[in-house]
Each structure stands twice: as structure tokens, then as C-alpha cells.
Amino acid sequence: MMLSPDQAADSDHPSSAHSDPESLGGTDTKVLGSVSDLEPVEEAEGDGKGGSRAALYPHPQQLSREEKRRRRRATAKYRSAHATRERIRVEAFNLAFAELRKLLPTLPPDKKLSKIEILRLAICYISYLNHVLDV
């Protein structure tokens, strides 16, 4: 579980981990927002019956940093950019595994190995080479 800088500072105290609802394990109740986020905001002037959208939802300056982040991440542009970055990351990850696979001796040489098999075989092979150098 990754901690935000705010949570990391409080994580030294075991009792503080359970005092914040967001730090509890399981589902995060604030991910989708809460009912209070959608309640009308009191207007400073007027009778409060304006009916405009601005009156129904909090002004962006009134939102917490976390809520602003959630709203930004909910946009199609952000999701598309994130998907592109993730696709590039996964492709680089798979290329690195393919390069490592080429360096490992197996019988037959073209045998398909899973990623965990590649890692375990690499560990054994490096250990073997280390042993050969020590002798």
C-alpha cells in the first residue's frame, strides 16, 4: 500500500492508523466522494434559492487537494494519457523479460517460459555462474 506524504508522517504511530477512515484497509469510502460533497453550499448573499449549478456544488477553491485530484483523474483526457503511459510501461517490462530470457540456457532453447520461471531460472543461473567463478 502506498502512503501519501501526509499518511507517511502519521504512520509511525500505530494508534493513528485506525483514527483516519481513509487509512483503514478495505474499500476507501471517499474514492467516489461522499454525500456531503454533493450537498448545496450556502450562498453568502441572496435567499439561497438561486437554482444555479454553482450553488449546488462546492466552488473549486473549497475542494480539498484530494478531491481536486480525484476530479482531475476522472476526466477522459487523463484516463487516456494514463492508459498510454501504462501501455508503454508494460511493453518496456515485457521487452526486458524477453532480453533476459535470451540470456538463459534452456532445453529446448525456444521453450516458452512464464515471467516467474524466467526470474527463477535467472537466479539459479547467476548463482551457478557465481559458483563457477569462486572455484
Swiss-Prot record:
Residues 1-80 are annotated as: Disordered. GO terms for molecular function: DNA-binding transcription activator activity, RNA polymerase II-specific; DNA-binding transcription factor activity, RNA polymerase II-specific; protein dimerization activity; RNA polymerase II cis-regulatory region sequence-specific DNA binding; RNA polymerase II-specific DNA-binding transcription factor binding; sequence-specific double-stranded DNA binding; transcription coactivator binding. It is found in: Nucleus. Residues 68-80 have a biased composition (Basic residues). It comes from the Eukaryota. CDD domains: bHLH_TS_HEN1 (cd19701). The keyword ATP-binding does not apply. PROSITE patterns: BHLH. Homodimer. Interacts and may form heterodimers with STAT3. PANTHER family: HELIX-LOOP-HELIX PROTEIN 2, T-CELL ACUTE LYMPHOCYTIC LEUKEMIA/STEM CELL LEUKEMIA-RELATED. Transcription factor which binds the E box motif 5'-CA[TC][AG]TG-3'. Involved in regulating energy expenditure, body mass, voluntary physical activity, mating behavior and reproductive longevity, acting through the hypothalamic-pituitary-gonadal axis. Acts as a transcriptional activator of target genes, including NDN, PCSK1, MC4R. Is also a transcriptional activator of KISS1. May act centrally to regulate function of both white and brown adipose tissue. This is Helix-loop-helix protein 2. It comes from Homo sapiens (Human).
